[in-house]
Amino acid sequence: MSEAGFYNGKIDGIWGPKSEAAYNAFIARETDTSNLDIAWSAKVSPEFIQRVKMMCQNLKMDENGPDYMMSCMAWESGETFSSKIKNGAGSGAVGLIQFMPSTAKNLGTTTEALAAMTPEEQLEYVEKYFKPMKGKLKTLSDLYMGILWPKAVGKAEDYVMFDKAEAPTTYRQNSGVDLNKDGKCTKAEAAACVMNKYNKGMLAVNRRVKI
């Protein structure tokens, strides 16, 4: 404690009130995250961070919006935040939020063009994609639904997206998110994977010190 600067009294080897106070101060300092930037900020450039913050502000997201956005991109890009990363299943999707070829076309570009961009440049198209949902992305699950199943944005957490009985093919393609294996994939179940990325991204090791 003395070497860490939390105790300047006589060191007697006895654990007393002053020792406990110094220890508590040390723990408080080491667990204080107020000087850390948004989730996953250690993985990207300062410019990327600022663009994400501005984008979330433009989309009328809450104060946690940048953390949520970074968590969704961490999930979609396998924590790489690469503009070039491709879908492993061969769907043709690419980039920060795995733009499908049809999605890229609707945004006035192509997946090839998106893959040729820097991550910072591609954020322009991430914002363009979410723009029709401006003001509606209030929760982490809503934001992720904006990528996975836009019809679920604003719905309750128990909203059923894929039902085995009603749409067996769609359910089979997404059965991995049916966590309780009841034949129904809910919004909350689908968002659970992204919540895990949020929790991981908020760890100090994955965040930059604010500039």
Predicted regions and their residues:
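General N-terminal targeting signals
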Residues: 23-24, 160, 164, 202
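Intrinsically disordered, low-complexity segments enriched in small/polar residues
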Residues: 1, 5, 21, 157-160, ...
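Short, flexible helical or helix-coil boundary motifs
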Residues: 8, 30, 59, 198-201
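Generic alpha-helical secondary-structure signal
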Residues: 22-26, 125, 146, 193
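Catalytic glycan-binding domains that act on GlcNAc-containing polysaccharides
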Residues: 34-178
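Short acidic, glycine/serine/threonine-rich helix-capping segments at coil-helix boundaries
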Residues: 2-36, 87-90, 111-115
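Acidic, glycine-anchored loop motifs typical of Ca2+
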Residues: 10-13, 17-18, 113-115, 168-209
